[in-house]
From Swiss-Prot:
It comes from Schizosaccharomyces pombe (strain 972 / ATCC 24843). GO terms for biological process: telomere maintenance via telomerase. It is found in: Cytoplasm. WD repeats lie at residues 44-83, 105-145, 150-194, 207-247, 252-292, 296-337. This is Guanine nucleotide-binding protein negative regulator 1.
Length: 399
C-alpha cells in the first residue's frame, strides 16, 4: 500500500491543499499519487489516477489507476469534517484493490449497492480479451463472469457497462449491439442481445451504428437508456435498451462520444466527446438540431472526461488545462484551477449522489521534459523524452 500511495511532499503547495474558490468549495480530503524520480521512456511505471466514480449510496469511491488497478476507498466523512489544518489524507481507507490482467475498458457500480449490506457490495469490470467480472469488494471474490464472444470464439471487452436500477440486469455495449446479462441467475451468456445496426434492423427503424462507448439512464424514467458510440452517434431506447430505437442523432463535433449525462428533469442530454472543446446539449423532445453548446470546455483530448450535473440546469466539467468549470444553462459562470502549477486533464468531476455539496475530483498524468542527447554528434543530436514524475490526486471537495 505504501508503494501504491506516495505523498508528493515537495509539491503540496501546488496540489491544492487550501481553498481555491469560495464558489466551488475547498478540498477536505485527498489521496496523492506522485513521485519525483527521473527516468527515460519507454519504461513508464509511474502511477496516476485515470478516473473515479461514487458508489450509489455515496459512501465509497471506486478509482482506476494507470497500473490497471481498481481501488475502493471508504470515505471517512466524519473525519473529513473535523480536519481543519488542510485536507485529510484518506489513503489508509483503502478497502479493496483489484488488479486487472489486461487494460480496463470500463467499470460500473452495482446499482443497489449499500455499504452495510455486504452481499450488495459489487462492481462490474470489463477488460481487454477478458470476460466481464462481477466483483464483491467486501469478500474479494469474483461472484460471476459474463461472456461476450466474437465470431472467432474469443472473449471481447465492453467499453461501457450499466446496471439497471432494479439491479436485475447488467447491460454491456458491443459493436452494433448491446447485451443484457441476468445478475440474479448468474447465467454467463446474455439473456438478450439487441442488434442496433445491420440487416436485422428494419429500414423503418432508427439504426445506431458503431462501437458503443457510454450509457446513461434517464433520472425521471429509469427504463429510458441513452447510448453513445465512437461513431459520433447517440440513440435513445426504451425498456433499458430494447428495440425499436426511439431517437437517433449525430453530434456536430468531436471524434466519438465518451460521456452522456441527463439533466435533472430528464428532458435534456449533455453529450461529451473526444477532441472537442464543447459539450453539446440536446433536447430529446425535439432533436432536429442541437439546443446549444457549452463553450470553453477545454476537452481537446482522447482521454475520457467525466462530468456531472450540479443543482438545476448547472453542469460541472474538468478540462485539459487543470481547471473545473461550471455552466448555468449555457453561460460559463465559474472557473477554478485545481492542479497547481500543472496543466493536467481533470478527468472526473462527480457530485455525491446522496449529498450533492460533496464532489469527487480526479486528475493525473506524467510530467515530461526534453533534453538533447549530447553523446550524439552535434549534427545528429536528438532530444531525449524524459519524464520527471507524476502529479495525480483523488480529492473530495465540499461546497
Amino acid at each position: 500500500m505504501d508503494n501504491c500511495v506516495n505523498s508528493f511532499e515537495d509539491q503540496k503547495d501546488d496540489l491544492v491543499h487550501k481553498k481555491k474558490s469560495q464558489n466551488f468549495g475547498y478540498v477536505c480530503g485527498s489521496i496523492n499519487l506522485g513521485t519525483n524520480v527521473i527516468a527515460q521512456s519507454p519504461t513508464k511505471p509511474l502511477n496516476f489516477f485515470h478516473s473515479s466514480r461514487w458508489s450509489p449510496d455515496g459512501s465509497t469511491i471506486l478509482s482506476l489507476t494507470e497500473d490497471q488497478c481498481l481501488n475502493c476507498w471508504n470515505v471517512p466523512f466524519s473525519d473529513l469534517s473535523k480536519k481543519a489544518d488542510g485536507p485529510l489524507n484518506f489513503s489508509k481507507h483503502l478497502s479493496y484493490k483489484y488488479q486487472s490482467p489486461e487494460t480496463v475498458y470500463s467499470y460500473s457500480w452495482y446499482s443497489r449497492m449499500k455499504l452495510d449490506d455486504p452481499s450488495s457490495n459489487l462492481f462490474a469490470v470489463s477488460s481487454r480479451d477478458q470476460p466481464i467480472k462481477l466483483i464483491n469488494f467486501t469478500t474479494g471474490k469474483n461472484k460471476a463472469s459474463y461472456h461476450m464472444i466474437d465470431h472467432q470464439e474469443r472473449y471481447q471487452g465492453s467499453h461501457c457497462l450499466q446496471f439497471t436500477n432494479d439491479g436485475e440486469y447488467l447491460i454491456a455495449g458491443d459493436k452494433n449491439c448491446l447485451h443484457h446479462f441476468n445478475i440474479r441467475t448468474g447465467c454467463k451468456e446474455p439473456v438478450m442481445t439487441t442488434v442496433t445496426h445491420g440487416y436485422k434492423v428494419p429500414l423503418w427503424e432508427f439504426s445506431l451504428k458503431g462501437i458503443q462507448s457510454c450509457f446513461s439512464l434517464n433520472p425521471m424514467d429509469s427504463k429510458t437508456l441513452a447510448v453513445g458510440t465512437y461513431s459520433n452517434r447517440v440513440g435513445i431506447y426504451n425498456d433499458c435498451g430494447r428495440r425499436p430505437c426511439q431517437l437517433e442523432f449525430s453530434i456536430e463535433r468531436g471524434n466519438g462520444v465518451t460521456h452522456l449525462q441527463w439533466c435533472e428533469d430528464g428532458e435534456k442530454l449533455y453529450v461529451g466527446s473526444r477532441c472537442s472543446d464543447k459539450i453539446e446539449v440536446w433536447d430529446i423532445r425535439y432533436v432536429r438540431d442541437m439546443v446549444y453548446a457549452l463553450e470553453g470546455h477545454r476537452g481537446d483530448t482522447n482521454q475520457r472526461i467525466l462530468f456531472d450535473t450540479d443543482k438545476k440546469d448547472e453542469i460541472l466539467a474538468g478540462g485539459t488545462d487543470g481547471s473545473i468549470r461550471r455552466w448555468r444553462n449555457k453561460d460559463l459562470v465559474e472557473e477554478t484551477h485545481v492542479t497547481g502549477n500543472y496543466d493536467l486533464t481533470v478527468n472526473t468531476v462527480q457530485a455525491n449522489p446522496i449529498n450533492m455539496q460533496i464532489k469527487c475530483v480526479c486528475y493525473g498524468n506524467r510530467i515530461y521534459k526534453y533534453e538533447k542527447d549530447e553523446s550524439e554528434e552535434e549534427d545528429e543530436s536528438k532530444e531525449k523524452d524524459l519524464w520527471t514524475g507524476t502529479v495525480s490526486a483523488l480529492q473530495v471537495w465540499m461546497d
